[in-house]
Amino acid sequence: MADMHSLFIAFVLGVVEGLTEFLPVSSTGHMIIVGEWLGFTGDKAKTFEVIIQLGSILAVVVMFWRRLFGLIGIHFGGKPVEHEGKTTGHLKLGHILLAMIPAVVLGLLFHDVIKSLFAPKNVMYALVVGGFLLLAAEWLKPKKPSAEGLDDITYRQAFMIGCFQCLALWPGFSRSGSTIAGGMLVGVNRYAAAEFSFILAVPMMIGASGLDLYKSLHFLTMGDLPMFAVGFATAFVVALIAIKTFLTLIKRISFVPFAIYRFIVAGVVYMVFM
């Protein structure tokens, strides 16, 4: 049976996961850092992180459920999803599948290598490099995006965003950061790039989390269920709030503050763990 200390750890990590999963600051990096501070490491901690990520994924499903079902041809009320963009295009399942291919291929080929990178030093470097990518996206993006809305995104842009997503295989880089920045660099409006990133996260994270969970099921016990339930529920609620807030925020501010934050966190990692 989980004690109060375990439930407290679950709550704290649930908050961290929910807050950072869809912000361009790296949830994995923060989970590793906070986990080290709380003394919650090892195989059980990794399994716990996988499960609470599913809570964050559920938040995206709740936020974008009409769009997600629309991708597979299911339209509730007989009406298609409201068109977002200036062209006559539509976001289709093919866009998502194309964006998934690069990271899926590399992830399967180098799964064990990627898992070996989960250490504070590697996270520190990823935070810095990812910060520079955010700055590059703001400074080098086209003055007038070719894709103003989600439905304007082309197959080529979707695939290129998928290539940028491969950077997120480096722990600490940030999946949302790499895909949103990549989207901006290939001509997608910041807001539309964020929406595409969140929708792309659903199949990507379910696949990655499902594989990790399958490989670590033997670390679970019935006594861990309360702890995992608290972490899952907390991550879901916090992620829901974080996504809504983030989508509102990026209409008004650039990613420069997020880049600066990443540099600060990298400095903290250096001082504490190096």
UniProtKB/Swiss-Prot annotation:
Cellular component aspect of the GO annotation: plasma membrane
Membrane topology: Multi-pass membrane protein
EC number(s) per entry: 3.6.1.27
Keyword Transmembrane helix: yes
Other facts: Bacitracin is thought to be involved in the inhibition of peptidoglycan synthesis by sequestering undecaprenyl diphosphate, thereby reducing the pool of lipid carrier available.
HAMAP family (alphabetical): Undec_diphosphatase (MF_01006)
The protein's name: Undecaprenyl-diphosphatase
Origin organism lineage: Bacteria, Pseudomonadati, Pseudomonadota, Gammaproteobacteria, Enterobacterales
Gene: uppP
